[in-house]
Amino acid sequence: GCFALVPLEEAAAPLVKLIRSFRPHVLTTYDENGGYPHPDHIKCHEISMFAFEAAADPDQFPELGEPWQVQKVYYHHGWSYERIVAIDAAMTRHGLESPYKERLANWQVDPAHDQRVTTRVPCSEFFEVRDQALLAHATQIDPDGFWFAVPREVQAEAWPTEDYELVKSMVQTSVPEDDLFAGRR
């Protein structure tokens, strides 16, 4: 089968159950374009947004546990033009070949999209853990690919954050933020 073709309610039910049992305060997902137009990532976005609403609604999926209201939803924005330019420049400064030259030459700059980021979470000390998690998806991630061609210390110098867009909040907060739990702490 194809994940992108699974009916929405069927695909969302396991996430509704997980939200109700785990009871998270924050949910992160892809934006409406899936980070880039990838059908499975777009489906992940649709499922996440549906499950966010359904998990809080006692009339939806009552067999999946007590309702739970996630308090904040963020879209992850990992591929901004600004970020890639900064990493490319850092590679050049370090005398390294940037894997992004061709991508940048063909990039369709969309300033409105890059301006959507509301939250930059400093997390460079966890880049190794992030990379190990990515590499665990052996069929999806090329360990010799462009992302892993950039040394972690260069990434940490050029762009030490993961970037998000706050799209739903049930708690008082103000942007910009540097913590996904702002308003909760």
Task: Describe the role of every protein-language-model region.
Residues L5-R185:
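Metal-dependent de-N-acetylase/amidase catalytic core
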Residues G1-C2:
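A charged helix-plus-loop insertion that forms the helical arch/lid used to bind
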